[in-house]
């Protein structure tokens, strides 16, 4: 099936008892066992079925199936937020004393987690230039466990060469983990380009309406955990925390996503609610249609800003003079999603005046909403970073980030024009 069809039909046929055409909301904590042996078999992971909604739920399972198939993976794990997905994706692979490699240009929450929280857990994060995959080898040692990047960075709006990163990571025996939130699987599937694990903040474009927090981890199913000395203890030996299961022996290609479910999710509990899963399924159904308008509007906004005398610079990867245009054309079909950034003449003060003058664009820190959104990253999403960290993350004091929605383009341009005029005063 094509991606547009997967988003509507994968993982569900009408429910056998009620014949419900819509995916039901299974608002339950627990599931009955046929008998004692059935319960034991479920806990041993010997049979398929549901145990407890902290670990799995039938509504959430449909969402997981659809997201996995959209990204071209073999399975997915949906959790309570995008940050929970990032946390669990990393924790599935690391322990105290390990290190990971990550690009410098990351979402502010991710950068803060990597730079400050992981080190307190005994995990070192080695930051590299997102344009230099060769730095992976120079930062790899025997305790390195993964390489992490964003396909399209937020808010730097840089584009990473995923095939080059994958090739270099694999040469070191490392999996490549890619946050694909900004691109979405509608525009780009990292797994098809060599990535092993994909992260989605379902809160953003997939949910699409600013109503629901959620995240997902997608397993590409291609990385060789078996026989890899970096992951001997993690996947190839009995796990005393879960009935002595050997993940590679028991789950084969799905060893990674199985461990993510029964170790970090089971033990720390950032479970997605069934009702949230239902709302995210509604958003997913129209993802392809919305992304067409997001991309169309964002390009027109970028072109408008590029010509405006009050604007110092514009960063949108689909612009002809963007340093990322070649990658967007090669890997994304020429479309660069709905996120862009720009700088206003007058710096931070003018940027604040611009933000305050907006009448249609909403002043908030989410992205991927059907409505257009604006924020000043240096004082919001990246406020916790000092000046040096801001520079490393690619966030300048004058940067304004726009998440361009699906409204009529004439209304969006009119709002931007009047706000830019107000910024001159």
Locate the predicted segments by residue:
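N-terminal "arm"/small-domain region of PLP-dependent enzymes with the aminotransferase-like
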Residues: 1-57, 65-66
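Conserved PLP-enzyme active-site core in the AAT-like
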Residues: 7-16, 76-307
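Conserved N-terminal alpha-helix of the aminotransferase class I/II PLP-enzyme fold
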Residues: 35-87, 109-117
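Well-ordered beta-strand positions enriched in small/hydrophobic/aromatic, beta-favoring residues
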Residues: 147, 215-217, 314, 340, ...
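Active-site beta-loop-alpha junctions enriched in small/polar residues
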Residues: 152, 181-183, 319, 345, ...
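Short hydrophobic/aromatic beta-strand micro-patches
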Residues: 218, 341-343, 403-405
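Conserved small-domain helix->loop->beta segment predominantly found in fold-type I
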Residues: 268-271, 275-277, 282, 286, ...
């Amino acid at each position: 099936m094509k991606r547009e069809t997967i988003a509507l039909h994968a993982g569900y046929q009408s429910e056998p008892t009620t014949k419900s055409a819509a995916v039901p909301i299974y608002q339950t904590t627990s599931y009955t066992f046929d008998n004692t042996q059935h319960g034991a078999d479920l806990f041993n992971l010997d049979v398929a079925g549901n145990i407890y909604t902290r670990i799995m739920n039938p509504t959430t399972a449909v969402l997981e199936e659809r997201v996995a198939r959209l990204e071209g993976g073999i399975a997915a794990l949906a959790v309570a937020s995008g940050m929970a997905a990032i946390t669990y994706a990393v924790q599935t692979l690391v322990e105290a004393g390990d290190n990971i490699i990550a690009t410098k240009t990351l979402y502010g929450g991710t950068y803060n987690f990597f730079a400050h929280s992981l080190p307190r857990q005994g995990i070192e994060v080695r930051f590299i230039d997102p344009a230099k995959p060769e730095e992976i080898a120079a930062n790899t040692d025997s305790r390195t466990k993964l390489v992490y990047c964003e396909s399209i960075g937020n808010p730097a709006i840089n584009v990473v060469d995923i095939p080059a990163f994958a090739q270099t990571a694999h040469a070191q025996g490392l999996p490549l983990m890619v946050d694909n939130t900004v691109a979405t699987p509608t525009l780009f599937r990292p797994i098809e380009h060599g990535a092993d694990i994909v992260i989605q903040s379902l809160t953003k474009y997939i949910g699409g309406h600013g109503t629901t927090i959620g995240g997902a981890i997608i397993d590409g199913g291609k990385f060789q955990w078996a026989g890899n000395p970096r992951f001997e203890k993690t996947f190839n030996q009995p796990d005393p925390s879960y009935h002595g299961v050997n993940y590679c022996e028991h789950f084969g290609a799905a060893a990674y996503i199985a461990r993510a479910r029964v170790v970090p999710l089971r033990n720390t509990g950032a479970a997605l609610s069934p009702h949230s899963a239902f709302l995210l399924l509604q958003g997913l159904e129209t993802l392809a249609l919305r992304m067409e308008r997001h991309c169309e509007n964002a390009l027109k906004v970028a072109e408008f800003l590029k010509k405006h005398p009050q604007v110092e610079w514009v960063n949108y990867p689909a612009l002809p003079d963007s340093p990322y245009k070649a990658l967007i054309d090669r890997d994304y079909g020429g479309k660069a999603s709905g996120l862009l950034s720009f700088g206003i003449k007058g710096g931070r003060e003018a940027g604040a005046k611009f933000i305050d003058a907006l009448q249609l664009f909403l002043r908030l820190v989410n992205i991927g909403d059907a409505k257009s959104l604006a924020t000043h990253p240096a004082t919001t999403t990246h406020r916790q970073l000092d000046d040096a960290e801001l520079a490393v993350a690619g966030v300048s004091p004058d940067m304004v980030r726009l998440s361009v929605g699906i409204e009529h383009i004439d209304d969006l341009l009119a709002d931007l024009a009047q706000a830019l005029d107000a910024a001159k005063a």
